[in-house]
Every structure is written in C-alpha cells, then in structure tokens.
C-alpha cells in the first residue's frame, strides 16, 4: 500500500504543477520516425542446366563458397537458396533454381553491385549456369518476417509477367487479392508470405518479370495440404482477374547444402 500512496502523491504533484496559471502546456510528443526503407534484393533465376549434376557440384563446391567469401565486401545481409521441384500443376519446373541476396536498402544494393567482389561472383556464373539465367533487382513490398530454415522448408511462388496496366494490377492486388490471401491464411497453413516487386534486370534493361509472391510452409507435406484447400483455390481463381500478363507458378524448397 505504501507504494500506491507514494505513486498517488507523485501524480498529484504533477497535476498541480501542470495546473499553475501562466505556464505553457507540455509540448506535443515528437512524431514517430519514418518507416525504414524497404529491403532490396538481387535475385538470379537459373534456367534448367544442360547437366544438373555438374551444376550442383560446381554450385556448392565453388560458387557458393566464392559468394560467401565476398559477403562482407558486397554487403548483403542474408542469402536464400532455393530449388524448384515442379510447376504448381505438377509438371516439370519452368526454372531450375533461384538465389536471392538481401540488402538493407537499394542504396546498399547498388553499392554492393559495384564492388570487385560482386564482379568476381558474377564472372563465375558462366562456369556452371549452362542453361542461362535471369538476374533482376527489386524491393520487398511487405514487412520482413523471420524465415524458417532448413531443407524441409517448402514454398509456392508466383512469378508475375509484366501486366498490361501496372496501376490497375497494383490497385486490385492491394485492395482485393492480398485480402483474399490473408483471409485464407489459417486454412492454407503457410508460415510466412514474401511479396516483392522487380525494378529492373541486372544489366539495366526492363525487368523480365513484374512481381513475385511466395508462401512458405514447414515442409512439402504441409504445402501439399495447403494447396489442396478451398481457401487456396479461391486465391488461385482470383489470379486471372488482375494478372493479365500471365504468370508462372512453381513449388520448391530451401536448400542449404548439396
């Protein structure tokens, strides 16, 4: 009880002080700081190589160690390596792998791309990416959240082609499509959503794709269950209403070792 009395007395003193005539009212609290800039990324989508076994051997034994050795110089803060397993409808995957380097913002990304370390990593691609690749930069358009790790983490991703009307796409995407995804989240069972928008190809030309959306699941079994739900069907049925440029839908998993 003593602590309560002391607290009450202190409160009365504050009120009395604030009530004295002639004194200016307390200043308004400072405005909250602006939100941090969106995270930026470089992504490489590998096309199917001529020899997948040779690709994997070089990728893990030489290329990934090279990128890791240059990490501090390039300045990326996280890396995500994934492998596509199939298209969403069960056919052979349209692409083979995807690698993403994350940066704090676009300024840090542009600085990293200009380093000798990044040039060394880029020059190495021709040594194993025999099927070709698509390299793009962009920004995440939703809040970052923790990512499950480990080779069992599965995902479904949609790569949107450039739409006929970008403004109309964005309006419908934000106002209608994303709420449908959110409403079905519990039923679908994904653990994380990642939304990204491509700014350009790495060489400065127009981006090969417009946007990418990924839903992550704990494992392939959870993904299979989730993509079989009525809620996921509702998400899929909504795509033709705004993705008028076409899209590629794939399933895959994270990889951290050969």
Predicted regions and their residues:
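C-terminal motif of bacterial Sec signal peptides marking the signal peptidase cleavage site
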Residues: 14-17
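Macromolecular interaction modules
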Residues: 19-258
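Bacterial N-terminal signal peptides that target proteins for export
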Residues: 1-7
């Amino acid at each position: 009880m003593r602590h309560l009395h002391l607290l009450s007395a202190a409160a009365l003193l504050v009120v009395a002080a604030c009530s004295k005539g002639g004194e200016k009212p307390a200043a308004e609290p400072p405005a909250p700081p602006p939100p941090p800039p969106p995270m930026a990324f470089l992504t490489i989508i590998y096309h199917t190589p001529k020899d997948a076994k040779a690709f994997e051997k070089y990728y893990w034994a030489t290329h990934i160690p090279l990128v890791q050795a240059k990490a501090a110089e390039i300045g990326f803060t996280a890396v995500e390596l994934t492998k596509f397993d199939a298209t969403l409808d069960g056919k052979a995957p349209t692409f083979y792998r995807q690698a993403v380097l994350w940066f704090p913002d676009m300024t840090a990304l542009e600085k990293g791309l200009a380093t000798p370390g990044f040039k060394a990593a880029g020059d190495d691609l021709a040594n194993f990416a025999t099927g070709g690749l698509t390299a793009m930069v962009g920004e995440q358009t939703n809040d970052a959240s923790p990512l499950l790790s480990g080779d069992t983490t599965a995902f479904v991703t949609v790569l949107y082609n450039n739409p006929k009307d970008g403004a109309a796409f964005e309006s419908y995407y934000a106002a209608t499509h994303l709420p449908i995804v959110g409403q079905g989240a519990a039923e679908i069972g994904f653990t994380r959503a990642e939304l990204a928008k491509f700014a350009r190809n790495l060489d400065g030309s127009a981006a090969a794709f417009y946007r990418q959306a990924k839903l992550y699941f704990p494992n392939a079994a959870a993904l299979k269950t989730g993509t079989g739900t009525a809620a996921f069907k509702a998400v899929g049925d909504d795509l033709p209403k705004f993705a008028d440029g076409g899209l590629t839908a794939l399933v895959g998993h994270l990889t951290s070792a050969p």
